[in-house]
């Protein structure tokens, strides 16, 4: 008689079923990787220092009372250099800078935030009046950030924001250019860096500031906006009699956003597919939105900037002023739109979009901005070639804009500026205007490679490293 196969013990079947169930359960709760990572501390081994130029009337360059006249060309900041040399700003010196309207923030590689400049709105995050205050015109640490390792900083005209390595956002100062207060629920200016209730359960990976509004981006790709919404820069309608409603951060109807940027009175976002969205003030066509009204009331795609129209290249940075905007692509090309008068866009006279009307005209659809060729030993100061010669090989790595001027840094650390600079914010000495991107060159920059530039109201902060590798 044939033997029957031994029956599988019930306990074994049950255990197998339990194991399978546990396996499925484990698989179901596996968290997906976040769309946007929280910025971490710099891993650089180079010493980063601060260079500055521009207006000094509010102490925004942090040069103390020793500097009474505007700084016409970039110069190494002596106090910060001393702090970096003494390793008081961490192993690699500076990690970041943020120039506001008339105040400045710097982030060191210990994760500490320093401030200097105008403190009428408490944007410095510390007391500056005697007898207990510290000077407002030299770098001093922001108070109330113990245990908070900052990895990113941004600044508006009167507001300051820091993001930590754990995704926490704190802000201080105010939105007061239109009589507004600092934050929902606060009746006065806020000096101590404050966590916003709207983000208590959110991880923030990036932020951006216009003149009087702010954007925050979460790790899951959601954009929040708050501040002054008079020009729809918040992407929603704010009634004049209910202006305080703009002080509460609210999410925008956008998904999978990977970057946010702000012009003076408008806002921008880039999603995972590379599409660019804009909203806010557009009376000079500075958003780039096709056939748009003077106010773009909700996030609207800028079709001209889609990767399909740029051989797959994507926008990675946007820098906007009052009436102009520049867009940096990952190909190193820069495009611009808005008011072209007063040299805002950096277009030469022979550019096809300039010829019809030179006085003051609008560029509705973004056009590419030309840069001089990279310098060589034989030609250390090349000029901009004719438009018909095509675009040079210069690749831009970083851009920043003030109200009426723009800065760009190329891959070799060379700084360019153009636009209006009546307070020496162009860094070109006696030249207060530059029609096209012009190399900023002087003794201080000759030995330094610029890494990051931040354009403030009328002052500029630069992060630089020595080209020879020394401090």
Task: Please describe what each predicted stretch is.
Residues 100, 107-108, 145, 156, ...:
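Structural WD40 beta-propeller signal
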Residues 14, 26-28, 37-46, 50-73, ...:
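Short glycine/serine- and acidic-residue-enriched loop/turn motifs that recur at repeat junctions
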Residues 88, 142-145, 196-199, 250-254, ...:
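Surface loop/turn motifs at the tips and blade-to-blade linkers of beta-strand repeat domains
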Residues 153-159, 164-303, 318:
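Solenoidal tandem-repeat scaffolds enriched in leucines and small polar residues
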Residues 52, 103-106, 115, 159-162, ...:
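Conserved core positions of repeat-based scaffolds
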Residues 1-24:
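PEST-like, low-complexity acidic/proline-rich intrinsically disordered segments
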Residues 47-48, 102, 110-111, 157-158, ...:
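Short coil/turn segments that connect the beta-strands within blades of beta-propeller domains
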Residues 71, 77-98, 102-178, 190, ...:
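Eukaryotic helix-linker segments that join adjacent hydrophobic helices
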